Swiss-Prot record:
The gene is FIRA. Residues 29-106 are annotated as: 13 X 6 AA tandem repeats of V-V-[TI]-[QE]-E-[PH]. Keywords: Malaria, Merozoite, Repeat. This is 300 kDa antigen AG231. Residues 176-190, 236-263 have a biased composition (Polar residues). It comes from Plasmodium falciparum (isolate FC27 / Papua New Guinea).
Length: 310
């Protein structure tokens, strides 16, 4: 309602915005309703159409650029690593088997006394400890699965050590006979090389060949297993027969010639009865060790030995 018209009394403004009543003048104020056209100013809300600007997010389609990852097919170029098969040339290390000869050279200078019994028992303990540590390394192709025979051999070695110590104690109390025939010692001293030399040589071969770690070539190809076709190269592990060169350790037979030198020194020895007993115990222990070594399945690659389960 505008102008000089004053709404008083029973004057009622209806929806059609027509002033009626005592004013006398009926005036359509509908022209003012058009002022409400400002409400459509809310059309600015569709300005939110800028939100579709998020279409830039599909720019992440660059992620498929990771197709370059199959470029890792160059990793099979590591097949040159099998050139490390030349490492078994280190089988010349068994030449160090001559070092145990120094042990016998010192024994040759000894005379049959009570000191021989103690020294031989200490040597037997040291050789057992060395062979025990080397046996732990001998299962380098079993992928972490321990050999059950090791536990049995440990239990068998304990009473043998105690028996050697008891014999040493008993022999201290008994008088020693320095006139024992040299021929009797020849048969005994022939067993000494088996006790001191042969077990270390066979185990040194297995220990020295551990650095070949042919497993590294396998583990490096495992990341390439994302390319299933590349896994077809895993049969390249046919290089395992190449390890058949390990039997080239027939040089151990050369080590058997060493007892010939020990016999020459043995003819010069004059030992006590204690030597015969302690040496026989050492020979028994070496036989047990060589028996457990035969069971070492170095090409089974983690597959347990069925005889172990039995």
């Amino acid at each position: 309602v505008t102008g000089s018209c004053v709404v008083t009394g029973s004057c009622v403004v209806t929806d059609s915005c027509v002033v009626t009543g005592s004013c006398g003048n009926t005036r359509t104020v509908t022209t003012q309703e058009s002022v409400t056209t400002q409400e459509p100013v809310t059309i600015e809300e569709p300005v939110t159409t800028q939100e579709p600007v998020t279409i830039e997010e599909p720019v992440t389609t660059q992620e498929p650029v990771t197709i370059e990852e199959p470029v890792t097919t160059q990793e099979p170029v590591t097949t040159q690593e099998p050139v490390t098969t030349q490492e078994p040339v280190t089988t010349q290390e068994p030449v160090t088997t001559q070092e145990p000869v120094t042990v016998e050279e010192h024994i040759d200078e000894k005379k049959g006394s009570e000191g021989d019994n103690i020294s031989l028992s200490s040597l037997s303990e040291e050789t057992e400890e060395k062979s025990h540590t080397k046996k732990k390394k001998s299962s380098w192709l079993k992928f972490g699965r321990g050999n059950k025979n090791d536990k049995k051999s440990k239990n068998e070695k304990k009473p043998s050590l105690e028996s050697v110590k008891q014999n040493a104690d008993e022999q201290k109390e008994q008088p020693t006979d320095s006139q024992i025939s040299v021929n009797a010692q020849d048969s005994v001293t022939i067993q000494e090389p088996t006790a001191t030399q042969e077990p270390p040589t066979t185990q040194e071969l297995t220990a020295t060949q551990e650095p070949t770690t042919t497993q590294e070539t396998v583990t490096e190809q495992e990341p390439t297993t994302t390319q299933e076709t590349v896994t077809a190269q895993e049969p390249i592990t046919t290089q395992e027969p190449v390890t058949a060169q390990e039997p080239v350790t027939t040089q151990e037979l050369i080590a058997t010639q060493e007892p010939s030198t020990t016999q020459e020194h043995a003819d010069e020895k004059k030992a006590s009865e204690g030597d015969n007993i302690s040496l026989s115990r050492l020979s028994e222990e070496t036989e047990e060790k060589s028996h457990t070594k035969k069971k070492s399945s170095w090409l089974k690659f983690g597959r347990g030995n069925k005889n172990d389960k039995k």
